[in-house]
């Protein structure tokens, strides 16, 4: 329990330190630039990072810990492609909801069937892809095909590694042998808690906007 609490605290503390773009804001011009940017991008926002952690834990108990996260990665890549570089107002609220949903499912303590897990990963992953696509265009500007391919490869590789790696930590280091084990459920609760906080922020912002405040 102490190890889990310490790890969660370190993850929260480390997030700002990790939030530095590999290219220091320089424009992407080559495949390598896109690859580096893709590797660094999930670390720019703790909301994306926490969702990937939840994917890793949920996938762990489907019996397909290595391959189930690919559904999320495929949907995320589709979201990046579909975004067309546009920013959609509904994306950030849906990302908050995605954390609440997937974190809640993990905290529930029951293993998801493979079809349900894949549907959740894909359905929610699209919104993360739309967010990545919008930020890619907004921060990096127009990107060539080679840059975009490199970006998607880097983005997918690092997120797969994070998801699978965290799943291994939960099972092998924290000793979670089932979806109902405390480390797994607490991991889900942590993610759901972040989602709930973000949902409250979204609701607060909407309320202030409706009242003409701020």
Q: Locations of the language-model features?
A:
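Residue-level signature of the transmembrane alpha-helical core
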Residues: 35, 39, 73-74, 100, ...
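A small-residue-rich subset of transmembrane alpha-helices
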Residues: 56-92, 142-172, 184
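Final/C-terminal transmembrane alpha-helix of multipass membrane proteins
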Residues: 184-205
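Interfacial helix-loop-helix junctions of multi-pass membrane proteins
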Residues: 24-31, 86-94, 133-152, 201-214
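Divalent metal-coordination and catalytic microenvironments
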Residues: 19, 45-48, 100, 126-128, ...
């Amino acid at each position: 329990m102490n190890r889990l609490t310490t790890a969660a605290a370190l993850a929260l503390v480390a997030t700002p330190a990790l939030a530095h773009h590999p290219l220091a804001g320089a424009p992407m011009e080559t495949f390598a630039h896109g690859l580096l940017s893709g590797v660094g991008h999930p670390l720019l926002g703790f909301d994306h990072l926490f969702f990937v952690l939840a994917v890793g834990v949920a996938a762990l108990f489907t019996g397909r810990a290595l391959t189930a996260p690919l559904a999320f990665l495929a949907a995320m890549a589709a979201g990046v492609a579909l975004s067309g570089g546009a920013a959609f107002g509904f994306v950030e609220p849906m990302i908050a909801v995605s954390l609440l949903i997937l974190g809640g499912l993990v905290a529930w303590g029951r293993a998801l069937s493979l079809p349900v897990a894949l549907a959740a990963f894909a359905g929610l992953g699209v919104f993360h892809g739309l967010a990545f696509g919008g930020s890619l265009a907004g921060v990096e500007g127009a990107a060539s095909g080679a840059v975009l391919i490199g970006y998607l490869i880097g983005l997918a590789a690092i997120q797969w590694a994070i998801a699978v790696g965290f799943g291994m930590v939960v099972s092998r280091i924290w000793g979670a042998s089932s979806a109902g084990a405390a480390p797994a459920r607490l991991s889900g609760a942590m993610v759901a808690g972040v989602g709930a906080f973000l949902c409250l922020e979204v609701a607060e912002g909407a309320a202030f906007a409706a009242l003409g405040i701020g």
